[in-house]
Amino acid sequence: MSRRNLSLSSRNENTRNKKAVRNAVRFDHGEIIAHFHEGLSSVKGQMALARTLNEKGNKEASDSICRSQIVMAESLLDFYLHEISKCCLCEMYDGVRAQSKEYSNLRVSLFRVEEAIYSKASRGWLLDQITEDYSSACFLSERSMRRQLTVIGISYKDMLERAFPDKSDDQRAKIVSKLFARRNAIAHQGDRNHVDATLNQVDETYAIYYIDCVERIVASIHSLVVQGLTA
């Protein structure tokens, strides 16, 4: 019986394919809001499907779509906040937007500092740094959204007043807290009550109202962002 050759073969060095480094893309205001509206159009299209299913007597499927689009609408809000934050912070660096207090406290890695020094003609290092920092962040709570708007120089109070002009301050605050609470219930609890595990009620009317509130919030933020340009 012949012996098996168990010796390790030599490995050629530097033969692995190197992954291409993808730098963050900087979008302007128009592109960012266009991304949001594109996603929102899809959400509204799904709501039309929910209506059709409900009219045909398939309420369970209709309700399921309503719940999924509530979560989707907030994901669009979250992504919008990420993209508009990167845009505004880069504009502060460029000198076309007033710098917020929080801008001065941004954390920058030594690697990015070296990149900035050796590539003076490029400002991509800052966008890459911000993208890296925000990649795991979520702004879907009243506290985190308020804090993030402060970072980019937007007043949370002004945003709510512009989004819901016919409501009182207390009513505006409740709208936002309820929006985030319902999204969390759907995304993390299957939309069931913590007390007795009963399924929360949902219908097309509520989902459309919810989606409209998200659209109002984004429109308000965006108008304040554009208004804040200094050059």
Q: Can you say where each PLM-predicted feature lies in the sequence?
A:
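Short helix/strand-bridging catalytic loops that position acidic/His residues to coordinate divalent metals
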Residues: 57-61, 196-205
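Charged/polar positions within long, soluble alpha-helices
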Residues: 48, 52, 78-89, 181-195, ...
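Secondary-structure capping and boundary motifs in well-ordered enzyme cores
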Residues: 65-69, 73, 178, 206
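Intrinsic-disorder-associated interaction segments
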Residues: 25, 29, 36, 70, ...
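Charged alpha-helical initiation segments
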Residues: 2-71, 83, 101
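Amphipathic, Lys/Arg-enriched alpha-helical patches that create a basic surface
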Residues: 39, 148-185, 200-231
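Helix-loop junctions and short alpha-helical segments
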Residues: 72-73, 79-167, 172
